[in-house]
């Protein structure tokens, strides 16, 4: 959506947000019972790649994945047909969310490498038939809000000049907003569950306090306690990504690793035991010389960690969250489920922290999760 799609900038933003939330409550349930569930990640990635190829908006991409989830949930589909289904979902979503000239053409889809490599050729008749089947399955209703439909509205209030970075006033508000959008988009790719949790997770990574201010509570209508569990899982997935990126960088050679702003700390990690979700509110001791007065929410340091010591140049951002729980990286999920990655969060987890990658006061560097 272009100008008319930027509803969060208009006078009716609050009303539209309320209508989307109402529709979200009536979304079809996703049960994850497809016989081809193991192939879901491949086809979700296919949709993401094709979306990026044609520069489709995030709402179109996420709607396409959600349509694919629901359709796979109801039918037993062959692998060859799944290519047709996935691309048809993307076409329907782009027709619903984008302008007409942005919708991919049949010839463009057939020229994609994934199609030519598998000797697959889409025909106009096949696409029309599949689109009709999809529309009938969803009762001709494609107004299915995903987190991508809410994220821009929430980002409009995600960063404010009154926010504190590491307990101090922000030096560069615009760059903070830029990285807030980057992290929100990153977390959005991990989970389609709650856009508000993506914003909160991004604020945690950027060490903004208070973590969930009153304005965001009022804007999203989500309380901090409601978001805690989802935020925790998003951060686990993010830190697994950072760990993998650091591992790949280390394999590239010690010299390239030394040039990186984000490096793995040399000190051994220490196990920290916590219980969910109370660990998000435990006290935190750091090597900071100054502390900001208590605020309405726990600080970012209190949320992300419990008793680890950070090495500071100017200001830092936590990373390297190592857990015994293994995520699968960028797994998109249906709106109705908590997460589509095999992460079972136990009541009590044993977690080792080793956080040291740094972001200075001007945020000039992107964390490893953006380099993959």
Curated annotation (Swiss-Prot):
Domain (Cyclin N-terminal): residue spans on this chain: 15-143
Alphabetically ordered keywords of this record: Cyclin
CC per GO annotation: cyclin-dependent protein kinase holoenzyme complex; cytoplasm; microtubule organizing center; nucleus
GO process annotations (BP): G1/S transition of mitotic cell cycle
Record-linked SMART domains: CYCLIN, Cyclin_C
InterPro entries assigned to the protein according to its UniProt record, in alphabetical order: Cyclin, Cyclin-like_dom, Cyclin-like_sf, Cyclin_C-dom, Cyclin_N
Top-rank lineage group of the source organism: Eukaryota
GO molecular function, one term: cyclin-dependent protein serine/threonine kinase regulator activity
A Pfam family hit: Cyclin_C
Family, per entry: Belongs to the cyclin family.
Full protein name: Cyclin-J
Gene designation: CCNJ
């Amino acid at each position: 959506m272009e100008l008319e799609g930027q509803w969060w900038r208009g006078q009716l933003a609050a009303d539209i947000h309320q209508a989307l939330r109402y529709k979200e409550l009536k979304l079809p349930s996703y049960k994850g019972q497809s016989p081809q569930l193991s192939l879901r990640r491949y086809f979700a990635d296919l949709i993401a790649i094709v979306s990026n190829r044609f520069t489709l908006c995030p709402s179109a991409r996420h709607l396409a994945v959600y349509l694919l989830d629901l359709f796979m949930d109801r039918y037993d589909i062959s692998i060859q047909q799944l290519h047709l289904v996935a691309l048809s979902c993307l076409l329907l979503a782009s027709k619903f969310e984008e302008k007409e000239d942005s919708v991919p053409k049949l010839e463009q889809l057939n020229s994609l490498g994934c199609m030519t490599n598998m000797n697959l050729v889409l025909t106009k008749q096949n696409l029309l038939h599949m689109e009709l089947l999809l529309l009938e399955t969803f009762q001709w209703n494609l107004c299915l809000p995903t987190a991508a439909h809410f994220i821009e509205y929430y980002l409009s209030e995600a960063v404010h000049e009154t926010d504190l970075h590491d307990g101090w006033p922000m030096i560069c508000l615009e760059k903070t907003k830029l990285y807030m959008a980057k992290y929100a988009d990153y977390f959005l790719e991990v989970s389609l569950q709650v856009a508000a949790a993506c914003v909160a997770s991004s604020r945690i990574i950027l060490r903004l306090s208070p973590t969930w201010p009153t304005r965001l509570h009022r804007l999203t209508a989500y309380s901090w306690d409601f978001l805690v569990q989802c935020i925790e899982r998003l951060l686990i997935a993010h830190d697994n990504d950072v760990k993998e990126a650091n591992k790949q960088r280390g394999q590239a050679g010690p010299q390239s690793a030394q040039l990186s702003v984000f490096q793995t700390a040399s000190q051994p990690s220490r196990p920290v035991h916590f219980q969910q979700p109370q660990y998000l509110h435990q006290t935190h001791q750091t090597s900071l010389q100054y502390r900001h007065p208590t605020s309405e929410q726990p600080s970012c340091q209190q949320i992300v960690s419990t008793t680890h010591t950070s090495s500071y140049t100017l200001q830092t951002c936590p990373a390297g969250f190592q857990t015994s729980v293994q995520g699968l990286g960028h797994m998109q999920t249906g709106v109705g489920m908590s997460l589509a990655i095999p992460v079972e969060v136990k009541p009590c987890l044993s977690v080792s922290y080793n956080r040291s990658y740094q972001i200075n006061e001007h945020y000039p560097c992107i964390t490893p999760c953006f380099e993959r």
